[in-house]
């Protein structure tokens, strides 16, 4: 059987129309623009209002990616949505499939928090390499504003909403060069959006649990320690599998969590700042959307050129992490 390669042939993104900057946040919690920027690098974030949804953002980002790739929705074989904040707990990918008019596409959600997009990328690539599908649409989208405690300045300053998408296509030359994924459930409590059960008696002798999800909780110091250790290791392992030296990288594309984290990982890998893609100043941490959103911006700005080699890494709740080395088509 002839080996089937994988290429990324298009990208797209979408952000909500409502903006919340640090000055406005200082009216909600005890903080300041200087405090937030010095600790996170974030200046503002975009937030979904009642007229928008995860589905609407994801659909908009997908259409932009399809347009760039010159592919119609009817050509899509598979849609994978990476999200932790679906419009419907049963899944949102199928609704996106319907909105796009991608009738023949199989569609499903995956949940790996801020690592989700890279897990989706690796998953989609396997369907192509196995000869099952030709065109795979990958979407990373999250609306974390739904689950933020807006009175907790440790977390409310960090998160924003958004969506990003890329299109994978089978090709003769393989542009997905290497990857490394990891999980560590022993540190699950460091970053969580937990279900809080409430007891409800439905009949004598029968009690069920009907509760809701609690706002995002995070141990920032432990997450930082985990990322600075695991992410450089994952990137180095992925580079080894790709047989590429680190100095051959054109770009480092990390999950846009915190500028301190981006700087620390780049320093560990001896990657100069001019090779580090960062847009979290304008969007904050958009979870699964952050990598495709940042990628789409630099592609459309003309910074990323055909043939550029990119090391992408996502990390977050689970705890989970992943790194992918790919070449822009």
Swiss-Prot record:
CDD domains: KAS_III. It comes from the Bacteria. InterPro entries: ACP_syn_III_C, ACP_syn_III_N, FabH, Thiolase-like. One of its GO terms (molecular function) is 3-oxoacyl-[acyl-carrier-protein] synthase activity. Pathway: Lipid metabolism; fatty acid biosynthesis. It catalyses: malonyl-[ACP] + acetyl-CoA + H(+) = 3-oxobutanoyl-[ACP] + CO2 + CoA. Its main location: cytoplasm. Keywords: Acyltransferase, Cytoplasm, Fatty acid biosynthesis, Fatty acid metabolism, Lipid biosynthesis, Lipid metabolism, Multifunctional enzyme, Transferase. It is found in: Cytoplasm. It is an enzyme of class 2 (transferase). GO terms for cellular component: cytoplasm. The active site is at 114, 255, 285. The last Arg residue of the ACP-binding site is essential for the weak association between ACP/AcpP and FabH. Catalyzes the condensation reaction of fatty acid synthesis by the addition to an acyl acceptor of two carbons from malonyl-ACP. Catalyzes the first condensation reaction which initiates fatty acid synthesis and may therefore play a role in governing the total rate of fatty acid production. Possesses both acetoacetyl-ACP synthase and acetyl transacylase activities. Its substrate specificity determines the biosynthesis of branched-chain and/or straight-chain of fatty acids. Belongs to the thiolase-like superfamily. FabH family. This is Beta-ketoacyl-[acyl-carrier-protein] synthase III. It comes from Trichodesmium erythraeum (strain IMS101).
